[in-house]
A protein has these predicted regions:
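PAPS-dependent sulfotransferases, especially Golgi type II membrane carbohydrate sulfotransferases
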Residues: 12-57, 64-131
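A short beta-strand-to-loop transition that corresponds to the Sensor-1 phosphate-sensing loop
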Residues: 5-8
Length: 131
């Protein structure tokens, strides 16, 4: 199991920005989004206690800042062989059916790290619950 976590504020900002079409609407309500995030955080803590040796926890920011090292750790955890092409993921022409399709065909970029700082005033309700 590979669990990638991210700065809670950046993570929630990304969810908020992407307008996922969930009928419950939790992703577009600052208070509810914060509550869901905190539930997720507690749940991951629970799973980490149960499956400690089976979960590799990776911070998104670490992958961005030290890509090769972190991808090598992921590859090793999966008991796969390293190939230099692992760093060329953005050159893959296979279709991508996720909200990140537009990002996955580009090299890694740092502009999403601490992006939340641009919206601290507008998302004060959300961010105050995550502190």
């Amino acid at each position: 199991i590979i669990h990638v976590s991210r700065n809670p504020k950046d993570n929630c900002l990304s969810i908020f920005e992407n307008l996922f079409d969930y009928p419950e609407g939790w992703n577009s309500d600052q208070k509810e989004l914060a509550e869901y995030y905190l539930i997720y955080k507690d749940l991951m803590e629970f799973w980490n206690n149960i499956f400690r040796d089976s979960i590799l926890n990776v911070r998104y920011e670490d992958v961005i800042l030290d890509t090769e090292k972190k991808i090598k750790e992921l590859i090793s955890f999966c008991d796969l062989n390293w190939e230099d092409s692992c760093l060329d993921f953005h050159k893959n022409n296979n279709p991508i059916k996720t909200v990140s399709f537009n990002q996955a065909n580009k090299p890694i970029y740092k502009s999403s790290i601490k992006k939340y700082e641009l919206y601290e005033k507008e998302l004060e309700v959300l961010f105050s619950k995550l502190d």
